[in-house]
């Protein structure tokens, strides 16, 4: 009798372990299938995001350049599509049909009035700002200040250049001055030597008569 309960417990344990293994295998298979499905979805999204060039530019050299639309252009086009949905007036009933044409006439009238009003205002000078004189005066004063600063800067640069040239000229004169002094002393020495020679020759030509 004691062997039967033990064998029964062992059988239950084996069944429980088998059920656990089966559930684990089922979970792993489900996880693998989910991962494969996720991979497939990602690949599908990547394939859809492939951009088509908006236009292709051909150069004379034979090269081509593809121009793609930016994300902002795509967003603007989507907004325009959302704001202005296509409407076929032939498929509308009488009420929406009349409302559609009334809205179209009103928008066209407003756009024409806006255009004409802008042109008339520009002709009559109404579109100019109220304080345009003050604005013009401010810009004129600012321009004069800029011109004055430019003149001052140019005069300072010219004065600086003049000072540099003057210093260079003074240095050149100082470097040349010892040479001129040496040459003048050399000339004076020559003159003195020539004078002494003339005195000696005259004394030789006119000997002094000694009384006997």
Swiss-Prot record:
The keyword Coiled coil applies. Residues 161-179 have a biased composition (Polar residues). It comes from the Eukaryota. Residues 1-33, 146-179 are annotated as: Disordered. Residues 13-29 have a biased composition (Low complexity). Residues 135-172 form a coiled coil. Keywords: Acetylation, Coiled coil, Phosphoprotein. The modification Phosphoserine is found at residue 69. Belongs to the FAM177 family. This is Protein FAM177A1. It comes from Bos taurus (Bovine). The gene is FAM177A1.
């Amino acid at each position: 009798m004691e062997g039967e309960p033990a064998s029964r417990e062992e059988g239950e344990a084996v069944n429980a372990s088998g059920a656990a293994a089966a559930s684990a295998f089922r979970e792993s298979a489900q996880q693998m299938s989910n991962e494969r499905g996720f991979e497939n979805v990602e690949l599908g999204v990547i394939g859809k995001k492939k951009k088509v060039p908006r236009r292709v530019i051909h150069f004379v050299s034979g090269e081509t350049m593809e121009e793609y639309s930016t994300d902002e252009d795509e967003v603007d086009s989507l907004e325009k599509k959302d704001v202005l949905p296509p409407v076929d007036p032939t498929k509308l009933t009488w009420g929406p049909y009349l409302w559609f044409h009334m809205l179209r006439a009103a928008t066209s009238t407003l756009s024409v009035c806006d255009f004409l009003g802008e042109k008339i205002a520009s002709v009559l000078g109404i579109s100019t700002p109220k304080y345009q004189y003050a604005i013009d005066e401010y810009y004129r004063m600012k321009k004069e200040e800029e011109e004055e600063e430019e003149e001052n800067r140019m005069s300072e640069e010219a004065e600086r250049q003049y000072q540099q040239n003057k210093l260079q000229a003074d240095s050149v004169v100082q470097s040349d001055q010892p040479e001129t002094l040496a040459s003048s002393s050399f000339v004076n020495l020559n003159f003195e030597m020539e004078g002494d020679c003339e005195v000696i020759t005259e004394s030789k030509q006119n000997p002094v008569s000694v009384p006997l």
